[in-house]
Amino acid sequence: RLKIKGLDSNMLSCLPNLETLTCFNLKDGTHLGIKTPNLRSIDIYRSPKILNLNFLLDLKELRSIGLDGLSNVEEMPDLSNLHSLTGMSLANMKRLQSFPLYHENLKNLLLQLPFDVLDNIIPENLPNLKHISVNLGSDKKNGMVLDRFKGICEVGIW
């Protein structure tokens, strides 16, 4: 387990046994897949220098992703090839416009995203989802997203 502030993944030594990484102000994630091949959980907070998340695709053992405050990310990569991924939390990603979410194994989803992004999330693309929570914020339209999941999985508001 490693918690670090201001990480540049280029400067990491190879940490083949690291399973949990929590980063604040991540500067670059490009080499995380090479340096941390067994990473199972990653949480990235307040990292405005991150422009894309393609490096997540190299983290083949990921079970959990938490992203909060990545204010300059505009699109999420397609994570459907991360077969071990069962939990995802996305919050405060104000520029996020594209979120291709189809994932067979995802069981838990926690979201605080703009309605335009949330509106594209449909139950059929998440066949094993057990729990979804959405922060309604001031946009009451976000509740419509949750309505789609009622009767399919546990629904929560935060």
Predicted regions and their residues:
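Concave beta-strand-loop units of leucine-rich repeat
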Residues: R1-S13, N17-L51, F55-E74, D78-W158
